Amino acid sequence: MNTPPVSRRHSPKFASDSHRLTSARAFTSGSDTYHDVRPDYPPDILRLLRSARRVLDVGAGTGKFTQLLCESPRFDQVYALDPSMDMLRTLVRFAPVPAWQATAEHTGCAAQLFDAVTCAQAWHWVDTKQASAELDRITTRDAQVLLVWNTLDVSVPWVHRLSRIMHSGDMLTQGFLPSVYKPWIITDQVHDRWEQELLPAQVHELTHTRSYWLRSNERIRARVTANLSWYLGEHLGYGPNDIVTLPYRLDGFVLSKIAQKLP
């Protein structure tokens, strides 16, 4: 099996806006599995943000990043939104915050309400031009936005091949810059590496949280399962009780507003 080259893209490639929306809308079920096996975020990532009175977690999913915000003493009030009600039902079990069904492009929030906005593992699903304008509308003049991604470290050859079998989204090249629009500019960034430990069965469950799996039919799912079982068991030699150490790349970006000139 020949593995394609590592992605050089700064954003995922969608055939159309319809394709992007269809892929994003796959996350309408399986939230419990998602929360159990998707990786957490290193707490140090929050050091990129100033303390804030009100912070909104956009595309919060099951609340992985929302929990981190709630555990920090630096944020007085935490709010969350996500397009998926299934995800939100799981979120409120782990992060008891005001949460509602909405998108980054249409938050349903009042103007200038938030001092900070976070968006973890979700910015690539949105219309970045519309979302940039909406986040400008709902935030204060000196607000910050934090964009965060956990990505399998495909610079490791066996992990790159694994990501292709899992269809995990090798879509963001090392050193990528996210697409943002005025008035936002990137003012700070952090890049780190860390590891997640899973059993082989949990690697299968992790695969089941990917957009590709969620929107595939049973025939495709059976093929992915067979390929992954072969790769983990026969090729890499992992037994059912062995720990698979998955290396991750963490990329975080702080956005601030361009200073507005007074008339």
Task: Map each language-model feature to its residues.
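Conserved class I S-adenosyl-L-methionine
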Residues: 2-51, 53-61
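A generic alpha-to-beta junction signature in SAM-dependent methyltransferases
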Residues: 49, 126, 138-139
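Class I SAM-dependent methyltransferase SAM/SAH-binding core
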Residues: 62-106
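A short acidic, Gly/Pro-enriched loop at the edge of an enzyme's catalytic core
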Residues: 105-116
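A short SAM/SAH-binding and catalytic strip from SAM-dependent methyltransferases
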Residues: 115-129
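Conserved catalytic/acceptor-binding region of the Class I
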Residues: 130, 136, 140-198
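Conserved Class I S-adenosyl-L-methionine
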Residues: 183-263
